[in-house]
């Protein structure tokens, strides 16, 4: 499973740790949904590999807010992400933020959940953005959606997923 954020925030850029801003709910939601046996801190991101999980971004440029990115940056990021997925061949790509998914892959009507698109043999799922700015989703409702992904991924053969 490769999780893909939108782009590094300023705190992530400063620390080198994904989803590092204290208000970001990625790490709590990852645990609440059963992907990790305990809540990891951003500085523990390397432990994801031991659970069969990886993490990357659509766009490498750090910004204070994702809306500072251009449409071209998203499109270029989508192409680079596709190449990365083709090289690494995870079973699943989980794009954390449906708006980023829509922009990166040119699918303006995409919704949260499994996507028809596949990248090689990799299945794709768009997840809600765990940023504290996303008030439409609570940690609990996000954990439900992340849990749906986990259940679908476990149905493949469960390799690398805890539980």
Please annotate each region the language model reported:
Residues 1, 52-53, 122:
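Structural motif
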Residues 12-72:
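Short, surface-exposed acidic-centric catalytic microdomains
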Residues 3-6:
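N-terminal nucleotide-binding beta1-loop-alpha1 segment
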Residues 12-15, 102-106, 136-137:
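Short glycine-/acidic-enriched loop or helix-start segments at secondary-structure transitions
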Residues 8-11, 61-63, 130-133:
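A short, flexible beta-alpha/helix-coil linker loop
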Residues 21-22, 29, 65-81, 107-163:
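C-terminal capping/extension of enzyme domains
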Residues 50-109:
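Internal catalytic-core helix/loop-beta-alpha segment
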């Amino acid at each position: 499973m490769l999780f893909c954020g939108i782009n590094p925030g300023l705190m992530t850029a400063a620390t080198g740790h994904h989803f590092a801003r204290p208000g970001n709910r990625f790490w709590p939601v990852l645990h609440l949904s059963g992907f990790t046996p305990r809540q990891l801190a951003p500085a523990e991101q390397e432990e994801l590999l031991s659970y069969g999980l990886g993490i990357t971004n659509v766009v490498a440029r750090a910004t204070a807010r994702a809306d500072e990115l251009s449409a071209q940056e998203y499109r270029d990021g989508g192409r680079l992400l596709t190449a990365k997925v083709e090289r690494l061949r995870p079973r699943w790509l989980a794009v954390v933020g449906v708006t980023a998914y829509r922009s990166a892959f040119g699918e303006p009507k995409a919704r949260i959940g499994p996507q028809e698109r596949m990248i090689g043999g990799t299945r794709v799922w768009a997840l809600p953005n765990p940023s504290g700015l996303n008030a439409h989703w609570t940690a609990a409702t996000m954990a439900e959606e992340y849990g749906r992904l986990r259940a679908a991924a476990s149905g493949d053969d469960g390799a690398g997923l805890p539980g």
